[in-house]
């Protein structure tokens, strides 16, 4: 099924709204009676959403000062966008934290962010209250318990009377992996996030108010936050929020609400839907945009999705530091294995691994560095790590890849994931891609572990069979041996029921490495 991307608004080139607060206000004013959010039986129009945000902002303004950090510890819900935009209205800085984290993992993040208030859900209230007491955080607001959404919608009150936010004000704190073990805080301003929204709207063209979004990725993750909250509200679309990720339920929602933009994200989500019993009979005629991001996407899985639904998967490449994409397909066209071309206003270069300064010609592999008007201001309170990552105006991504002669970007591997086997560099993704082409394989993950025999490393492959399929590990070993040079073949293949997935729905290579070393158990078939 092919779609025309020459749509109203697809060629919009006007400057983005200067702040996210004004972006939100424009949406509320332009489409007050249109449905903004939908979850289960609860529905909020843009007018009701605007009222709820104003009411919560008034309460927050009594608890925090402008510039204070307010931590959002919320699942994907009606409450998340209310809390986020209310914090902005109160001139606070929202810090987006994964609500699935245990207390021991949250405590250092809240401390690092210097949070002065936490907004949470009833499920985590007791834990958050205890943490707040231990850390000296003055305020905890529990949405859905202390404060109910209908109560906020019905509340009347005077305007806040605070100054308007500026493009240079901080608008979000996100968390990215740190070299010391503690995640770094990625800081973005209103202006840079608003520019990022504009970039996404151009990369994956929108139809405006006719768009119906179904996001899967967590709103606390940059991909889910941008494509599931900011972009839909910017174009005054409708956001259908699933209660949970259950493949049959998601397919049902896609059909019932005539979803046009499915923010699937990582490969694990699409693999899950392909296994859904009701996918084959689903009417997906309204669906036109299926973007992917957050993890390398196997070409074979894209082909299976296209065969099952008639729809293309449009990849994007980005990270928390780039809010969130630097390259994307759709307008640039789909090229197998590529994440597309750099977005307008952005730049993607491939540089040598030794110095990071020499720009390589098309076809040569090296480290990708990116820049654009939507890149982070830096890592909060981490000047040294900021200087290591941002050099000469570019963010050094740590990703290995190349650009072809037509300008399409290809990602080969994370720099840190390259495995050294028998004196050769091996890219696990290449091996994963091959294993995915086996007719009986649903998912595969490949990692490197120390090899006591050689003193180097060896490859271990974890493979999940498709529903109803069984095979012996030696079958995969033979399959690889007939198609790869010997040092790229896994020395061990393990058949498992499922692969470990992170909270952002990415394949968890850290857990796979632990399992390969015998430090963690995975369910076997």
Can you say where each PLM-predicted feature lies in the sequence?
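Conserved AMP-binding/adenylate-forming core of the ANL superfamily
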Residues: 12-17, 25, 33-64, 68-77, ...
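Conserved pre-ATP/AMP-binding loop-to-beta segment of ANL
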Residues: 17, 32, 156-175, 182, ...
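Structural core segment of the AMP-binding/adenylate-forming
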Residues: 40, 59-62, 89-152, 160-163, ...
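Conserved AMP-binding/adenylation subdomain of ANL enzymes
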Residues: 194-212, 220-261, 276
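Gly/Ser/Thr-rich phosphate-binding loop
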Residues: 259-265, 274-335, 347
């Amino acid at each position: 099924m092919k779609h025309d991307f020459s749509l109203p608004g697809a060629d919009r080139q006007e400057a983005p709204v200067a702040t996210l607060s004004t972006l939100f206000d424009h949406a509320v004013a332009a489409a007050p009676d249109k449905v903004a959010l939908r979850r289960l039986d609860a529905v909020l129009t843009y007018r009701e959403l605007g009222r709820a945000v104003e009411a919560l902002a008034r309460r927050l303004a009594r608890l925090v000062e402008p510039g204070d950090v307010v931590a959002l510890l919320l699942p994907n819900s009606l409450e998340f966008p209310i809390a986020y935009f209310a914090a902005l209205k109160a001139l606070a800085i929202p810090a987006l934290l994964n609500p699935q984290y245990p207390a021991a993992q949250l405590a250092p993040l809240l401390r690092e962010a210097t949070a002065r208030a936490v907004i949470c859900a009833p499920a985590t209230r007791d834990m958050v209250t205890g943490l707040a007491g231990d850390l000296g955080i003055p305020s905890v607001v529990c949405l859905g318990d202390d404060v109910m959404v209908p109560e906020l919608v019905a509340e009347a009150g005077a305007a806040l009377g605070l100054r308007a936010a500026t493009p240079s004000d901080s608008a979000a704190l996100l968390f990215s992996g740190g070299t010391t073990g503690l995640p770094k805080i990625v800081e973005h301003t209103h202006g840079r996030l608003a520019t990022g929204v504009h970039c996404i709207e151009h990369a994956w063209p929108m139809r405006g108010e006719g768009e119906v979004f179904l996001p899967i990725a967590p709103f606390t993750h940059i991909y889910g936050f941008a494509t599931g909250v900011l972009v839909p509200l910017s174009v005054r679309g409708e956001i259908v929020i699933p209660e949970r990720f259950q493949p049959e339920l998601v397919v049902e929602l896609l059909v019932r609400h005539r979803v046009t933009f499915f923010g699937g994200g990582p490969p694990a989500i699409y693999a899950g839907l392909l296994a859904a019993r009701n996918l084959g009979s689903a009417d997906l005629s309204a669906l036109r945009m299926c973007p992917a991001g957050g993890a390398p996407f196997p070409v074979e899985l894209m082909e299976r999705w296209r065969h099952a639904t008639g729809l293309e998967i449009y990849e994007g490449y980005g990270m928390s530091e780039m809010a969130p994409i630097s390259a994307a397909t759709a307008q640039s066209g789909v090229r197998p294995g590529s994440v597309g071309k750099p977005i307008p206003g952005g730049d993607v270069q491939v540089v040598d691994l030794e110095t990071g300064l020499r720009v390589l010609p098309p076809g040569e592999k090296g480290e990708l560095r990116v820049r654009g008007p939507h890149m982070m201001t830096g890592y909060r309170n981490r000047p040294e790590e900021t200087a290591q990552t941002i050099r000469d105006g570019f963010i050094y991504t740590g990703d290995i890849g190349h650009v072809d002669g037509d300008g399409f970007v290809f990602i080969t591997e994370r720099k840190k994931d390259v495995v050294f086997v028998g004196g050769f560099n091996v890219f696990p993704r290449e091996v994963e891609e091959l294993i995915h082409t086996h007719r009986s394989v649903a998912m595969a993950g490949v990692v490197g572990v120390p090899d006591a025999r050689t003193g180097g490393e060896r490859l271990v492959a974890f493979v999940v069979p498709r529903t109803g399929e069984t095979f012996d590990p030696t079958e995969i070993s033979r399959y690889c041996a007939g198609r790869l040079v010997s040092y790229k073949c896994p020395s061990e293949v393990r058949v498992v029921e499922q692969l470990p997935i992170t909270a952002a729905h990415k394949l968890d290579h850290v857990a796979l490495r632990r399992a390969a070393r015998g430090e963690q158990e995975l369910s076997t078939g």
